């Protein structure tokens, strides 16, 4: 009896989640009157017959095409479309008139943490003492 109640509760939760009316998915039938109990296979067959489930199967024609770029397209010159954020650079622009600082080419002069990120420069005085 407890397993029957838990099966009905599970079915009710699934139906409530997907928004299907209960009578459409599993019609209420008294098991004593017909001599048969509706098993899980009958419920699966009823579920597969639904049009929404058939559309979401892989290989169906109802699949939506995804856009390749998260940026909205913008009309450019000559009617061509280009993504809005394609022209933006990921680099931080240097302020105008500022002198560019040259980066250290020798990476062995930096301290590295356990994640492979550098966090400071090694000092020559410590290396000579140590």
UniProtKB/Swiss-Prot annotation:
It is found in: Secreted. Metastasis suppressor protein. May regulate events downstream of cell-matrix adhesion, perhaps involving cytoskeletal reorganization. Generates a C-terminally amidated peptide, metastin which functions as the endogenous ligand of the G-protein coupled receptor GPR54. Activation of the receptor inhibits cell proliferation and cell migration, key characteristics of tumor metastasis. The receptor is also essential for normal gonadotropin-released hormone physiology and for puberty. Its main location: secreted. Weak in all tissue types with highest levels in lung and 15- 17-day embryos. Expressed in areas of the hypothalamus implicated in the neuroendocrine regulation of gonadotropin secretion, including the anteroventral periventricular nucleus, the periventricular nucleus, and the arcuate nucleus. It comes from the Eukaryota. Residues 110-119 are annotated as: Essential for receptor binding and receptor activation. Residues 1-19 form the signal peptide. Belongs to the KISS1 family. The modification Tyrosine amide is found at residue 119. Disulfide bonds join 71-85. Disruption phenotype: Animals are viable and healthy with no apparent abnormalities but fail to undergo sexual maturation. Mutant female do not progress through the estrous cycle, have thread-like uteri and small ovaries, and do not produce mature Graffian follicles. Mutant males have small testes, and spermatogenesis arrested mainly at the early haploid spermatid stage. Both sexes have low circulating gonadotropin (LH and FSH) and sex steroid (beta-estradiol or testosterone) hormone levels. The gene is Kiss1. This is Metastasis-suppressor KiSS-1. Residues 49-82 are annotated as: Disordered. One of its GO terms (cellular component) is extracellular region. One of its GO terms (biological process) is decidualization. The modification Phosphotyrosine is found at residue 110. Keywords: Amidation, Cleavage on pair of basic residues, Disulfide bond, Phosphoprotein, Secreted, Signal. It holds the Pfam family Kisspeptin. InterPro entries: Metastasis-suppressor_KiSS-1 (IPR020207).
């Amino acid at each position: 009896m407890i397993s029957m109640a838990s099966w009905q509760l599970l079915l009710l939760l699934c139906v409530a989640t997907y928004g299907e009316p209960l009578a459409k998915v599993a019609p209420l039938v008294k098991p004593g009157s017909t001599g048969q109990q509706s098993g899980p296979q009958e419920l699966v067959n009823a579920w597969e017959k639904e049009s929404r489930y058939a559309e979401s199967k892989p290989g169906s024609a109802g699949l939506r095409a995804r856009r390749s770029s998260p940026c909205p397209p913008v009309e450019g010159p000559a009617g061509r479309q280009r993504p809005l954020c394609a022209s933006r650079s990921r680099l931080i622009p240097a302020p105008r008139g500022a002198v560019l600082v040259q980066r250290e080419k020798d990476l062995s002069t930096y301290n590295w943490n356990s994640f492979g990120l550098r966090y400071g420069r090694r000092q020559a005085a410590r290396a000579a003492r140590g």
